[in-house]
């Protein structure tokens, strides 16, 4: 008899719509008991789509099947007509995407969620109605362009799992379309909840098309990068019309959210010029250059209503870019940063008038003692719209290890309410990341996000840790490997360590850190048995 796979792809049917929510199930080596419930397997949140299904071979030239096309909730693009999740949420209508993300967040663990009680805090499973309420209030978003049917919907908001974003994209210095598609798929395999294509080199349109057709997660872009390419690389040659046409081009391809640097105004530039590191946002520096050259207000700000007319037609979310994020800890929480944040709050209200979904981008480089103020200011000035941050990095001297630097700051900020962390790789400040850097960056930020979920009392996160602790205490090595965020690495490290020690058994009841005679857990078990 062939052995069942340890991981298998499963799908959970909806009750309101003909949807099937993709997850994976881990089969454990033996049952574990938690809070009186027995677990012989664990359903797990999965971002890999069909790319993670060993039974399916995805041809990148064909792409993924159009999952959402058969959901019996027809919406077509009509310019100027709101088609957004917020539009339906405010009308009291639950969409297929809302039911999908509710099922996905619960991970088939409703019984466990109801029984979970940590420090007197009771939790209920997430319902489609709760999702609708959070979207209607602007506290959560489901980025899902009508033109991206391959997408498996996900939700970003502080009452849901902390998400992470992976940045990919070519530059003028190298990388091909195939490499960037591979990085996008690779990101999804390791747990990226969204991917941003930040291509600035050749073939931007073609690269994005390939990525979208192969992506089960939302794809974001910074449209001003492509607009700048069309303007010959000169910021002063940008026009509203050129930018508008770029927005529509990317919207038609299926981009799910746009980073738009509409909050940097002429009045902010003197503050930025007094900084140690000035403006470190690429999009921010482009728009600052345009404003200074033309001595005019940022056209993304003056045309923001026009932008929203486009976004609401496709159900594209706006990620209000932090053009003035601090690029050094000395510049953190200064007048430039918080001045822009106030404008982002005003733009949030403006977007909501168009029923456009909004999230707010945040820093940046921020020392640990100033991180909490960032969360407080964002909630206050931006009306609790989801916060999406780059780290923050807590020191300026971690080059080569900035993924760890960022994950430390991100864990703290997410524990305080940040909704999504943008990953940083070991190549940050040094060069264009390759696929191994992408993996390192994703895993580091999955650690941060999961740690924040623990701090926020997420029952599904607590269950995974509890099972890991039980597996560790019982020396169930395969379960330990598979419950970790990177099973391949943990298995390889353990195997190499055992082999180097000369021990013959592959999975002994100790590790090489302590050896057979100094293992504290082994001794404790003997104490419990009366030995």
Curated annotation (Swiss-Prot):
Pathway: Cofactor biosynthesis; thiamine diphosphate biosynthesis. Its cofactor is [4Fe-4S] cluster. It catalyses: 5-amino-1-(5-phospho-beta-D-ribosyl)imidazole + S-adenosyl-L-methionine = 4-amino-2-methyl-5-(phosphooxymethyl)pyrimidine + CO + 5'-deoxyadenosine + formate + L-methionine + 3 H(+). [4Fe-4S] cluster binds at residues 511, 514, 519. Coiled coil: none annotated. It holds the Pfam family ThiC-associated. GO terms for cellular component: cytosol. One of its GO terms (biological process) is thiamine diphosphate biosynthetic process. Binds 1 [4Fe-4S] cluster per subunit. The cluster is coordinated with 3 cysteines and an exchangeable S-adenosyl-L-methionine. Zn(2+) binds at residues 365, 429. Its EC number is 4.1.99.17. Substrate binds at residues 167, 196, 225, 261, 281-283, 322-325, 361, 388. Keywords: 4Fe-4S, Iron, Iron-sulfur, Lyase, Metal-binding, S-adenosyl-L-methionine, Thiamine biosynthesis, Zinc. GO terms for molecular function: 4 iron, 4 sulfur cluster binding; carbon-carbon lyase activity; zinc ion binding. It is an enzyme of class 4 (lyase). Catalyzes the synthesis of the hydroxymethylpyrimidine phosphate (HMP-P) moiety of thiamine from aminoimidazole ribotide (AIR) in a radical S-adenosyl-L-methionine (SAM)-dependent reaction. Belongs to the ThiC family. This is Phosphomethylpyrimidine synthase.
